[in-house]
């Protein structure tokens, strides 16, 4: 297959549109369209859904994976020839809580490589693998232990969340000495964040009806919303600890939520991907529970 056409397909998916790809590649939108049509004609399949944003079809996902691997290996070959690790694109999927707590030391490691670049795709830990399956990323922080086809898995450790709220919010929902979990307003990071719902299943008898749910799609803002009484939420213990110590929030109970975390990456002979894996594992050893 034509590597230029594969690179164009990858640009469409990464930029989300034919127009975005044309800007990234410094070619006209019609040239982008012609390259994709030629590739589709070659494989005999439609590869891109012309939606907003543009998405790869099932056949397109196979080629996107191939294209991303090609780009990585080409960059590594170029770096080896020039004697340095440079201009190597590393794209991974990660959840917000990991990004805001234990993951930052990875930035130091990648920065020391010289010209390597790191692109993070933010997604709930229950859904990061979908990006890996589609070929959108090289690796993913996930709660799923079963490997995606063509990938290998490394256990990272356990992320602990604590159920917290302001004392006044807790007191407002105490009924006959018991906390009314179902009635108390709750916070979510986004529509895919079901951690609070899974946690609530163990605390409420029977199905939970309509609840007051606020969406706060920011790791820092989420903690701040809890601190200011917008609702209760599950916060990583490292973020909750300062607020608990200051008395700004309280534990709603003594039951922590422990989520095993894993790193899944393509099974690919790549020096930079191996180094990235080592960096992720080292950061997890320092920042997660065993």
From Swiss-Prot:
DNA-binding region(s) in UniProt: 18-37
Cross-referenced Pfam families: HTH_1, LysR_substrate
Domain HTH lysR-type: start-end pairs: 1-57
InterPro entries linked: ArgP, LTTR, LysR_subst-bd, Tscrpt_reg_HTH_LysR, WH-like_DNA-bd_sf, WH_DNA-bd_sf
One GO MF term attached to the UniProt entry: DNA binding
Domain of life, per lineage: Bacteria
Disruption phenotype: Deletion of lysEG decreases the extracellular accumulation of L-lysine, L-arginine and L-citrulline.
Keyword tags: Activator, DNA-binding, Transcription, Transcription regulation
Family as reported in the entry's similarity comment: Belongs to the LysR transcriptional regulatory family.
Function statement: Positively regulates the expression of the exporter LysE. Induction requires the presence of a coinducer, which is either intracellular L-lysine, L-arginine or L-citrulline. L-histidine also acts as a coinducer of lysE expression, but this amino acid is not exported by LysE. The lysEG system prevents bacteriostasis due to elevated L-lysine or L-arginine concentrations that arise during growth in the presence of peptides or in mutants possessing a deregulated biosynthesis pathway.
Protein's name according to its UniProt entry: Lysine export transcriptional regulatory protein LysG
Gene: lysG
